[in-house]
């Protein structure tokens, strides 16, 4: 299995810029590693780099699963995990914008606005 490349400075710039546009201020992000199954049939977990941030009680994570391959989810508690409905993105900007929109829609639905 090919090694998954680390998150690049340009990818971090995309995340930071998108979050600043969304929230109107700099959002602290963290780089970490996570172990996930890249394919549902995989028995072994693969280590992949992630970008994580927390905003207003919601946790966001973007997994880099390969060169120009990204997955994402947001969660409030371990048992409250949500995604965008797209398994994997080949464009980081589309991934993060879709993630932020899915969370905003979820929050609006929870408030009864949708």
How would you name each of these model-derived features?
Residues 1-55:
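Negatively charged, low-complexity tracts enriched in Asp/Glu with abundant Ser/Thr
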Residues 27, 44, 60, 86-88:
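Polar low-complexity intrinsically disordered regions enriched in Ser/Thr and small residues
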Residues 8, 14-15, 19, 56-84:
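Short aromatic-glycine-(Arg/Gly/Cys) micro-motifs in beta-strand/loop hairpins
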């Amino acid at each position: 299995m090919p090694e998954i490349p680390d998150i690049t400075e340009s990818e971090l710039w995309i995340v930071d810029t998108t979050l600043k546009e969304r929230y109107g201020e700099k959002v602290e992000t963290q780089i970490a590693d996570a172990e996930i199954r890249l394919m549902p049939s995989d028995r072994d977990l693969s280590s992949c780099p992630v970008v994580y941030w927390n905003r207003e009680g919601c946790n966001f994570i973007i997994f880099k699963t390969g060169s120009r391959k990204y997955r994402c989810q947001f969660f409030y508690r371990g048992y409250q995990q949500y995604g965008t409905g797209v398994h994997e993105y080949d464009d980081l900007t589309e991934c993060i914008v879709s993630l932020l929109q899915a969370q905003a829609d979820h929050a609006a639905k929870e408030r009864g606005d949708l």
